[in-house]
UniProtKB/Swiss-Prot annotation:
Source species of the chain: Rhodopseudomonas palustris (strain BisB18)
Localization: Cell inner membrane
The protein's role, per its UniProt record: Exerts its effect at some terminal stage of cytochrome c oxidase synthesis, probably by being involved in the insertion of the copper B into subunit I.
Species lineage: Bacteria, Pseudomonadati, Pseudomonadota, Alphaproteobacteria, Hyphomicrobiales
Gene for this chain: ctaG
Protein name: Cytochrome c oxidase assembly protein CtaG
InterPro entries noted in UniProt: CtaG/Cox11_dom_sf, Cyt_c_oxidase_assmbl_CtaG
The organism's place on the tree of life at top rank: Bacteria
Length: 206
């Protein structure tokens, strides 16, 4: 019986086929990982807002129904600026309030530059375990803030500490909270709506 000669050209072709398959699979895995990393950012932000994880404060729509508790707590106010020519300070460095009482405090911002600038504040509270109980009704941190050259503005924060904090054994004995803000620059501010009858001076307007 005559042995058929082996076509050696088939071997590298089969190897190239396997390499192409492996490369395709690796590319798909990388694409999925990149997509997952982008999806993880909004999910992480949502998770923090929903649970108070990592000291993320909550957003309330109204004052608590229950009356304030006799127990009081000290709230300290911290302010920072990163990458903006702004002076940013709290009008009070700390206050003592009953748990459950709605309070309004003010921060002052001055744009020290000679041109308009826009920023938005990131925020958290310490210790991190109280994030779920620190309820903001109104805050300048909810939106971008644009300041004209040299402009100074007082900006309110309306908040309360949820009375449920008093029943949390993890925060038993807690007597102080620090609310911290850091303003960061907004490179591409959201365009402001133009009122009816006013010319639109934005770039590209007809």
């Amino acid at each position: 019986m005559t042995e058929q000669p082996t076509n050696r050209n088939d071997v590298p072709r089969r190897g190239l086929g396997r390499d192409a398959t492996v490369a395709s699979i690796c590319g798909l895995v990388v694409a999925l990982m990149v997509g997952a990393s982008y999806a993880a950012v909004p999910f992480y932000n949502w998770f923090c807002r929903a649970t108070g994880f990592n000291g993320t404060t909550q957003v309330a729509t109204a004052a608590p129904i229950a009356a304030p508790l006799p127990r009081k707590i000290t709230v300290r106010f911290d302010s920072n600026v990163n990458g903006l020519p702004w002076k940013f300070t709290p009008e009070q460095t700390e206050i003592e309030i009953p748990i459950g009482q709605v309070v309004t405090v003010f921060y002052t911002v001055t744009n020290l530059s000679a041109h308009e600038t826009t920023g938005q504040a990131a925020y958290n509270v310490a210790p991190l375990t109280v994030g779920a109980y620190f309820q903001k009704i109104n805050c300048f941190c909810f939106t971008e803030q644009t300041f004209a050259a040299g402009e100074t503005r007082e900006m309110p924060v309306v908040f309360y500490v949820d009375p449920a904090l008093a029943a949390d054994p993890e925060n038993d004995g807690l007597n102080s909270i620090t609310l911290s803000y850091t303003f960061y620059p907004v490179r591409a501010p959201t365009p402001k709506p133009v009122a009816a009858g006013e010319p639109d001076s934005r770039k590209g307007a007809l």
